[in-house]
Amino acid sequence: LDDPRVTAIGLHIEGFGDLPAWQALSRKAHTKGIPLVALKVGKSIEARNATISHTASLAGSDAGANALLEHLGIARVDDLPTLLETLKILHVAGPLPSGQIASISCSGGEASLIADMAHDTTLTFPPLTDLQETRLLAALGPKVALANPLDYHTYIWRDVAAMTRAFSAMIVPEIAITFLIVDFPRGDICDPSDWECVIQSALDTRAATGGTIAMVSTLPELMPEHVARRLMAGGIIPMGGIRAALAATEAAHLRAPSPADLIVPSKSMPAETISEADAKRALQKAGVTVPKLLTGDLETLAKHADIQHGPFVLKSTGVAHKSEVGGVALSLTSGDAVRQAGAKMSSATFILEEMIADPVAEILIGVVKDPAHGFVITIGAGGLFAELLKDTASILMPASRDHLKQTLNRLKLSKIFNGYRNQPAGNIDALLDAVEAIQSYVLANLDT
């Protein structure tokens, strides 16, 4: 970090170890304007086992690793090619301000290919602005369909001035990076001189506009090293392979470490499981709003149901996943209904809760003490959809309310509790209050 030649740092991580040292590293790097990007292994059980077997690393959960890297402001990539391509972007251009991209190619096939490959990413191709369309029309004429991604055909190939005007027309401040898709032939079996025009046009465009430009080959082997060196010397990012280029562009977004200090987990004590009723009472004291509940034998609860008239939820006790064993009965409105439901459950004691009518969504909120990474808050789709959708997001404690809200909005389920298709929206503030209260409870009981 103290070497003035260093512009970005790539890391291969098996385990983290000293968490405060990682936090100090990330903060110093951010202060110096040196972005960090990591290839963190350990997504699979096999990789975690391999890590433990040949190093002293504590593997921890992958969700915890993701949360820690996010907390540190370190980008995470999945493979070596993407790591290298990300470092190229960071070295030449620095972190990108957004995921808005443009693409220019002389083939409709390449334009379609990059559009499809970007479909499942967070990157977007903004529609052309009026200014872009005016400039492109002047440079390309009426025969070219103007769009982003752009297929500029080959009408102007070999005309460096015209190609430069067309490329420059796509460069606008709203675009974080512009891709020029070019495949170079092998110099030992082909004459590459006909590609000189596109290299020079790209360099001239960069000099004229100052825009962030990457020349991308469809396959890694189609970007010769001598061309890459020449492009980089001219301020253009040479990239091998469209998929790796897109993944690298996602990873190269502007990031910053969290201002909150990491919580280093203490040595774990023997775990003690408390009952659902006791857990809810403890959380209620911490500020979490919970349904009114009673515990007791079936007849006592049935008599209560006759007086209060519900609707109620009846639950058996002693089983974690109650729905899988028929341990939950919903929408009970009388004592007889409670008796009939309880008779089908193998339990001596029960929980009777008031039932929330017409919920917008069920949300799972969990906290795990991950010895390798810290205390991990997971928020996601709950109830029936918890394991079916696997729609969750995890962050490290302590987390600010704004960070928690951003995490909620990363969920697919967020469309529902924001009011999907004119359906009633959920109370986001109440949900955030609950998450903050649960976080406060954990912070008050870190060593228990």
Model-based region annotation:
Residues 1-448:
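Catalytic-core regions of core metabolic enzymes
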